[in-house]
Curated annotation (Swiss-Prot):
Lineage of producing organism: Bacteria, Pseudomonadati, Pseudomonadota, Gammaproteobacteria, Alteromonadales
Pfam families in UniProt: AstB
Positions with a binding annotation for substrate: 19-28, 110, 137-138, 214, 252, 362
Active site: 174, 250, 368 (nucleophile)
Keyword Manganese: no
Protein name, per record: N-succinylarginine dihydrolase
GO biological process: arginine catabolic process to glutamate; arginine catabolic process to succinate
Species for this entry: Shewanella sp. (strain ANA-3)
Pathway listed: Amino-acid degradation; L-arginine degradation via AST pathway; L-glutamate and succinate from L-arginine: step 2/5
Function field: Catalyzes the hydrolysis of N(2)-succinylarginine into N(2)-succinylornithine, ammonia and CO(2).
């Protein structure tokens, strides 16, 4: 049977804006209050996804969340018509309105953690939506995320969906952005790397001082239990607290893995050597640990360019390629390193550059925009076929974006009642295009 790694990218929602909501994410804070272009953002994301499909990859799309989130605004005491709720929130609590209008679900690396059937005791593909408790604007996503995932991977014979973890900082979970999987072939049992920022229940353990550690060891271990993983299939590794304090808010900003390659910055982890030895012990295959030294790429350049927030994909030819943002080309140190990387004797043979600037300005590169799902051909056939990107769906989604999305949106525009109407009309049509059923609160 054939095995693949599919990528499911987040469709950028109609309210994509720059409100600077993500403390600890330098790009997000630096670009707060810029005027955004939701139409361009959605098209950039679709273009990147289609390019991967054209390379022969299995590429899916995940629907965005309903925003503005009037349910949450009502839950915290705003009342009246939709227009009145928006007006009151804009006047008395603009920061809360901004949080309820975020299009952050576009970064599906935070949607969930996924364990493929080759690793799990029951032989099913497991999904757990991330609770994202560290950030208000993302903590309101998981229930709808769970519905969208269930509608996308909709055959219970193959797919096992869990509820998100308890909504408490002890179980802070940021999904696949802090998780990667190493293996020989996608269909073989692999080793899942769970990267955490702190131990919530151990006050003496190392933790960052300036910015929050969004992922806890307790959350990572809970996911491993839920997903029925054996100890031999897991390695728990702590992210270096010093790099979190330099703006590395998720592990996918400082490391990325694919099959038998782990590409990471020398400052990425604590106890690096011991953990690499553990991976070698648990995964009996030839491994390539590509460590990028600080002397070649400083942390600030890695964060600015999102060198590690790239995708490493295995092309149908068997060669690996890096999918990088054009920002990597524009940073001399990073561009020089990537050119050097291609001369080293590793499976990575090419670098392909994509413009995802609308996402980058909010602090998310190519890897943030996708959820990786290792699947066999039966599982691919059992998934919702209307979510898999081909020429027809690509054309249809582009037409849908042209019809419903604005080409400029400022934070002041978020209080416009018309935005609610536009957003709901768009999402209602999208659920019909992608055959998702009633996943949104306004449809229920």
């Amino acid at each position: 049977m054939k095995h693949f790694e599919a990528n499911f990218d987040g469709l950028v929602g109609p309210t994509h804006n720059y409100a600077g909501l993500s403390f600890g994410n330098v790009a997000s804070l630096n670009n707060a209050a810029l005027v955004s272009n939701p139409k361009a953002a959605a098209k950039q994301g679709l273009q990147k996804a289609k390019a991967l499909a054209d390379l022969g990859m299995i590429q899916g799309m995940l629907a965005p969340q309903e925003r503005p989130d009037l349910n949450t605004l009502r839950r915290i005491g705003f009342s009246g018509s939709d227009a009145q709720v928006l007006q009151q929130a804009a006047k008395t609590a603009p920061a809360l309105l901004n949080a309820c209008c975020s299009a952050s679900s576009m970064w599906t690396a935070n949607a969930a953690t996924v364990s493929p059937s080759a690793d799990t005791r029951d032989g099913k593909l497991h999904f757990t939506p991330a609770n994202l408790v560290d950030k208000l604007h993302r903590s309101i996503e998981p229930t709808t995320t769970g519905r969208i995932l269930t509608a996308t991977f909709n055959d219970p014979h193959y797919f096992h969906h869990h509820n998100h973890l308890p909504e408490h900082n002890s179980f802070g979970d940021e999904g696949a952005a802090n998780h990667t999987r190493l293996c020989q072939e996608y269909g073989h049992a692999g080793v899942e790397l769970f990267v955490y920022g702190q131990e919530a229940t151990n006050p003496n353990a190392p933790r960052p001082q300036k910015y929050p550690a969004r992922q806890t060891l307790e959350a990572s271990m809970a996911i491993a239990r839920l997903h029925q993983l054996e100890e031999d299939n897991c390695v728990f590794i702590q992210q270096n607290p010093d790099v979190i304090d330099q703006g590395v808010f998720h592990n996918d900003v400082i490391a990325v893995g694919n099959q038998n390659v782990l590409f990471y910055h020398e400052q990425a982890f604590l106890n690096t050597q011991a953990k690499l030895d553990e991976i070698r012990r648990k995964l009996d295959t030839e491994l390539f640990f590509i460590e990028v030294p600080t002397t070649k790429v400083a942390i600030n350049n890695a964060v600015k360019s999102y060198l590690f927030n790239t995708q490493i994909i295995t092309l149908p030819s068997g060669e690996m390629a890096i999918i990088a943002p054009t920002d990597c080309q524009e940073n001399p140190a990073v561009y020089a390193y990537l050119n050097e990387l291609l001369t080293l004797n590793t499976p990575i043979k090419q670098v392909l550059y994509f413009d995802v600037k609308q996402s980058m300005q909010n602090g998310g590169g190519p890897a943030c925009l996708r959820l990786r799902v290792a699947m066999n051909e039966r599982e691919v056939a059992a998934a919702n076929q209307h979510t898999l990107l081909n020429d027809a769906l690509f054309a249809r989604l582009n037409t849908w974006v042209d019809k419903h999305y604005r080409d400029r949106l400022s934070t002041q525009d978020l209080a416009d009642p018309q935005l609610v109407v536009e957003s709901r009309t768009a999402l209602d049509e999208l659920t019909q295009i992608m055959k998702l059923g009633s996943v949104y609160p306004f449809q229920r």
